């Protein structure tokens, strides 16, 4: 409904409006340096996704779905229904601070209430199912209080943009139903399931139209087929999902119940992050119009600078403020005048004094207690999905290495103790090389430049 209204306000057909904005997000993935072989950009209208959503619907048992009259309080910005007690005074959405709408119509409902016991058992046997633990406790409490069935369709006459419900062209799938399915549709689930043919579902006028079907589908950023789903969902032990704290119930309860109903294994882990907030601590949101265009930041500061800020300066689990001023301060302090200055000073000492990098010495880093400690801490950060912790560990090495330059002053020592100074510079080159390798997942371009500089030092 949000897309339909936004397109109408822009004076465009919904399909044209959505395609134009989708391309902007597709470009963002490229600009942020996401590995094309590891991501698949997917949209509601993609055949791969439509087949997956319709197939999942068709796999539910008759007792999992029923059709009934419904009246609810709906926020267009959140694309979600709210209980009265969850709203602010005046029936305002707690996120957008705008009035919710009363929706009255006949919808299909998913029997969410039937999965309370199974969900609680899932949380009990999987203590790391939701990270951080405070969010696991939150969803456990929510489910423990009892569940209400939720609407999974809208009338196509009122919401003419969505995936047609199998065998009922008068309804399209509710956005939160089909959106959750992308976790399996994007990795080729519909191709991995026999009979995933949705040709019997005819789209009503204005609804998403199916493209031609195939068994191997991609958008130019990674082709997926039946083996892709088996690899990522089954052979790796499950999929890790990331979402904002306002999606906790959808991801950790509703989606898991849908998987159970279809006979699929649950997700492996769900990481819940906080909001990125703007002025006044308000959540950044397209609907609120208080976002900052990351492409503009990339254009001025480069991809790695943006990746650095997101990983190290934003909390992985709590709300984090973002302003241009904070970004500039972090860039100058930790990248330009921090890492950048350190690399420049070490390479100048190495090239100016003919000291080259000795790769065989990298294996001796165990004698540097701070590097081993930071390396272990970095690994723990990645294992616990705490990227900020991993980045802080790397910057501890950077700070220690900078302190060594200040304390030993090899650029001065070289005049009175050439051998000692050269040994210091060799150690600094090793440290710089290790810093480069550890930065690869966070700042790949910068890391590769550092590694190249060190390896080619003479």
Predicted features along the sequence, with ranges:
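N-terminal, positively charged nucleic-acid-binding surface of large information/translation enzymes
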Residues: 1-128
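Hydrophobic residues in alpha-helical segments
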Residues: 7-9, 123, 142-143, 260, ...
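Surface-exposed helix-capping loop/turn segments at secondary-structure junctions
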Residues: 32-38, 63-66, 261-266, 348-358, ...
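Beta-strand segments within the central parallel beta-sheet cores of soluble alpha/beta enzyme folds
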Residues: 40, 269-272, 451-452
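Structured secondary-structure scaffolds
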Residues: 48-59, 95-96, 102-194, 222-352, ...
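Short, glycine- and charge-enriched coil/turn segments that flank and shape catalytic ligand pockets
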Residues: 90-91, 125-126, 168, 193, ...
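Intrinsic disorder/low-complexity segments
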Residues: 192-224, 362-364, 369
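Helix-rich, typically C-terminal accessory recognition domains appended to large enzymatic cores
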Residues: 313, 318, 326-363, 367-458
């Amino acid at each position: 409904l949000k897309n339909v209204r936004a397109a109408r306000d822009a004076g465009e057909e919904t399909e044209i409006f959505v395609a134009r904005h989708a391309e902007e997000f597709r470009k963002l993935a490229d600009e942020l340096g996401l590995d094309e072989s590891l991501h698949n950009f997917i949209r509601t209208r993609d055949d791969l996704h439509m087949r997956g959503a319709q197939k999942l619907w068709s796999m539910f048992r008759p007792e999992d779905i029923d059709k009934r009259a419904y009246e609810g309080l709906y926020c267009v910005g959140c694309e979600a229904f709210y209980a009265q007690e969850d709203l602010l005074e005046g029936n305002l959405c707690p996120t957008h601070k705008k009035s919710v709408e009363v929706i009255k119509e006949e919808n299909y409902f998913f029997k969410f209430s039937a999965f309370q016991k199974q969900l609680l058992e899932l949380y009990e046997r999987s203590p790391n199912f939701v990270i951080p633990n405070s969010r696991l406790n939150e969803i456990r409490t929510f489910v423990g209080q009892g569940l209400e069935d939720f609407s999974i369709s809208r009338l196509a006459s009122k919401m003419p943009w969505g995936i047609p419900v199998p065998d009922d062209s008068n309804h399209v799938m509710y956005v939160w139903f089909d959106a959750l399915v992308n976790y399996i549709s994007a990795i080729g689930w519909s191709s991995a399931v026999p009979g995933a043919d949705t040709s019997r579902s005819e789209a009503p006028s204005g609804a998403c139209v199916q493209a031609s079907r195939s068994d191997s589908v991609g958008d130019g950023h990674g082709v997926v087929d039946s083996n892709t789903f088996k690899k990522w969902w089954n052979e790796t032990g499950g999929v890790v999902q990331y979402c904002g704290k306002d999606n906790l119930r959808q991801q950790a309860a509703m989606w898991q119940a849908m998987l159970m109903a279809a006979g699929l294994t649950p997700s492996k882990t769900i990481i819940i992050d906080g909001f990125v907030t703007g002025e006044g601590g308000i959540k950044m949101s397209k609907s609120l119009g208080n976002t900052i265009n990351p492409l503009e930041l990339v254009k001025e500061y480069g991809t790695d600078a943006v990746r650095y800020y997101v990983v190290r300066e934003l909390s992985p689990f709590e709300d984090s403020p973002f302003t241009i001023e904070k970004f500039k301060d972090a860039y100058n302090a930790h990248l330009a005048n921090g890492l950048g200055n350190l690399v420049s000073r070490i390479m100048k000492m190495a090239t100016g004094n003919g000291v080259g990098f000795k790769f065989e010495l990298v294996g001796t880093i165990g004698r540097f207690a701070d590097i081993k400690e930071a390396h272990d801490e970095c690994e723990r950060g990645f294992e616990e999905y705490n990227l900020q912790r991993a980045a802080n560990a790397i910057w501890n090495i950077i700070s220690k290495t900078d302190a060594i330059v200040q304390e030993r002053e090899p650029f001065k020592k070289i005049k009175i103790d050439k051998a000692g100074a050269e040994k210091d510079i060799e150690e600094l080159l090793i440290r710089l090389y290790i810093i480069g390798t550890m930065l690869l997942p966070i700042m790949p371009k910068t890391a590769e430049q550092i590694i190249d500089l060190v390896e080619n030092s003479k």
